[in-house]
Amino acid sequence: MADMEDLFGSDADSEAERRDSDSGSDSDSDQENAASGSNASGSESDQDERGDSGQPSNKELFGDDSEDEGASHHSGSDNHSERSDNRSEASERSDHEDNDPSDVDQHSGSEAPNDDEDEGHRSDGGSHHSEAEGSEKVHSDDEKWGREDKSDQSDDEKIQNSDDEERAQGSDEDKLQNSDDDEKMQNTDDEERPQLSDDERQQLSEEEKANSDDERPVASDNDDEKQNSDDEEQPQLSDEEKMQNSDDERPQASDEEHRHSDDEEEQDHKSESARGSDSEDEVLRMKRKNAIASDSEADSDTEVPKDNSGTMDLFGGADDISSGSDGEDKPPTPGQPVDENGLPQDQQEEEPIPETRIEVEIPKVNTDLGNDLYFVKLPNFLSVEPRPFDPQYYEDEFEDEEMLDGEGRTRLKLKVENTIRWRIRRDEEGNEIKESNARIVKWSDGSMSLHLGNEVFDVYKAPLQGDHNHLFIRQGTGLQGQAVFKTKLTFRPHSTDSATHRKMTLSLADRCSKTQKIRILPMAGRDPECQRTEMIKKEEERLRASIRRESQQRRMREKQHQRGLSASYLEPDRYDEEEEGEESISLAAIKNRYKGGIREERARIYSSDSDEGSEEDKAQRLLKAKKLTSDEEGEPSGKRKAEDDDKANKKHKKYVISDEEEEEDD
């Protein structure tokens, strides 16, 4: 506000200029009072003329004055005492300066119309506060300052008008709540008006400065009170006051209306843009009033200036005011699908999807399921043949392969004793009856047993938890429910002696036992080839042993000869006569036999005559050859074998000796 003081001066300067302008404003005020009186008397005719010309009334343009008048009363109540004192001082100055009683009478006579006119302008200023606060403020202030500059008003008149002036000042307080930029723009708009004189512009600037200095601290305190009292405090003006206000507004010159029309439109848009941050309730009321004002302004072309489009482009319209709390004004999220009404698809009401019903006629299948239904999970040792038994199409089960049921479990080989079968046959009368190889027997103690052929199985009953087991009948591609199982049955073999139990145990044993891959068969007879080889080996061992014995005996005899002379050695012919028929060996004969015998034996072994003769000769020659090879080994031999060899050698020696003796005799 420092700029405002530099431009328009201080309060002291404005008081001095006001005293100077009092004298010159008397004549103007007289004319205005006369015009206002005449206009007040003929208000009804003017109202009809304005209705015919199509110009909307202030009530139609700006809504009911009662909405914002309560707020102006409340906002201006705090400064009532201060301003009343200022007004009383101004009235005292005017009383001292004006001493002419005729002027006092003249002004007292025009007191009622002036008061009415002032009240009309001030009430209109309060009503314009909601829509066009700035425009009516300028217009009402011009007239107010033009009338209040009169120095001939009495103290009573000033005191009576003080309350009405405070209402207009309350409307000015709302305008001063806006930012400094809005005030500067308003001041520049007021300065650019060419129709206003310099005195009027100076008065307007002084008024704005005074109001800003006096009411600025109060405006911030009354913001919350105005917002809270908008809905509570309603207009207190009666219908007569409204009519009087409208009649007081009409006598203004048409030139002044055209002159201030541009200012009014600009002030409307400024006030609307400045009040964009008000509460949601005020914004909604602004929208309703602007809608009414826009309708009335569209009807009257005379009220809209030519440069209204430029003003709309500069400040925007009432439709541009947006409340931050309205979710409908928010733009849709980028990337979110939007329907034809501009709303996101997730905000649309979800329409229920109609159900698709297809009417199909299906025959109802009724089956006699009996009184009790039981759910049975067959063990691997029981099976059921669903088809009736027919000997023509019966196929025996495979014994070498294990059968797999529909559930993939390994079952025992299906035999007659563990498969439930049934058939249809005719009785003696020719009626068809059903027979089965199984039956369930219920005993007196409540227990049950299943008799399947010669096998007996114990049946145990247990309840089923939950409704998860149902009986369905397949019908085409669909299933038709028949019943719900509540009880289940389990089967167990009655004893371990049953054939079924034995099959179970045998099957388990077969799975666990390991088969021997290699089998050894016992030999029934002996192989002749193997026997021959064994006999050859034994014979060779015996020959080797005999050869070893002979060599050993020879060494023993040689040792005995080397010990000394003996009787047989010294007298070899002593017993010849006595032992003619007995065997006798001389030393010379032994030497000759030994020397010649070796040569002959060697010759015999390697001669061609060895092939001739018996097998015994061959065996003897073989033994002799082996003895010659084993002389050097010197292995000991058994005593018994040595005696046998000695006997054989003695016999041979005897034979050899006898041959030599015969040759000698010859």
From Swiss-Prot:
Main location: nucleus
GO annotation, cellular component aspect: Cdc73/Paf1 complex
Self-association state and partner proteins as the record states: Component of the PAF1 complex, which consists of CDC73, PAF1, LEO1, CTR9, RTF1 and SKIC8. The PAF1 complex interacts with PHF5A. Interacts with TCEA1, SUPT5H and CTNNB1. Interacts with SETD5.
Residue positions, PTM Phosphotyrosine: 606
Gene assigned in the entry: LEO1
Organism: Pongo abelii
Residue list for modification N-acetylalanine: 2
Protein's name in the database: RNA polymerase-associated protein LEO1
UniProtKB keywords: Acetylation, Activator, Nucleus, Phosphoprotein, Transcription, Transcription regulation, Wnt signaling pathway
One Gene Ontology biological process: negative regulation of myeloid cell differentiation
General function of this protein: Component of the PAF1 complex (PAF1C) which has multiple functions during transcription by RNA polymerase II and is implicated in regulation of development and maintenance of embryonic stem cell pluripotency. PAF1C associates with RNA polymerase II through interaction with POLR2A CTD non-phosphorylated and 'Ser-2'- and 'Ser-5'-phosphorylated forms and is involved in transcriptional elongation, acting both independently and synergistically with TCEA1 and in cooperation with the DSIF complex and HTATSF1. PAF1C is required for transcription of Hox and Wnt target genes.
The organism's place on the tree of life at top rank: Eukaryota
Compartment(s) of residence: Nucleus
